[in-house]
Amino acid sequence: ASDVYKRQMKALEHLRTINHHKMLVMKQCFQVGLYKQGLLHDLSKYTPTEFLVGCKYYQGTRSPNNAEREDIGVSTSWLHHKGRNKHHFEHWVDYSLDGEHVIMGAPMPRKYVAEMVMDRISASRNYLGDAYTESQPLEYYLKSKDSLWFIHPRTKKELEGLLRILNDHGEKKLLHYIKYVYLKQEPKSRIKY
């Protein structure tokens, strides 16, 4: 009976974690005018493919996807998630036409880059709790920056720039900049999102 209880508690804690994360992102999305994205953010986490894996590998201090990847060599939950959520740069990886690489990143629309920044802030808050500082999302990004060759250069530059605003000037100024400057300057594209 104690194993059943432990599994139930992990499921409840995982649900609480994803609900809290979703609410943090939604609040920030609403603050910058991204209402639809705020409402729809990470809904795939409630599907059986992602939710059941999250319950099984829940630890509370990091993504269950990392634990699944360590256990079986791949995260089925992550593969499902990135394919359905446009705020992940991995969603935008496609075959390359440059002849140098097999795959490459397509440029992300700014509304999804903005959501990605809010996602990173909220994930850091969720996993770090009271230890969270506004430098954490940038520090986390910088740890892997040199390995992220498959992100489109413009997306990479914009992501780092927004994280630096958070680090140097704080969340309030970041959200103001996103709403009144960044989202108003979407580069022209022939792609329909």
What are these regions (language model features)?
Residues 1-5:
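Short, small-residue-biased leader/transition segments that mark boundaries at the very start
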Residues 7-193:
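Metal-dependent phosphohydrolase cores
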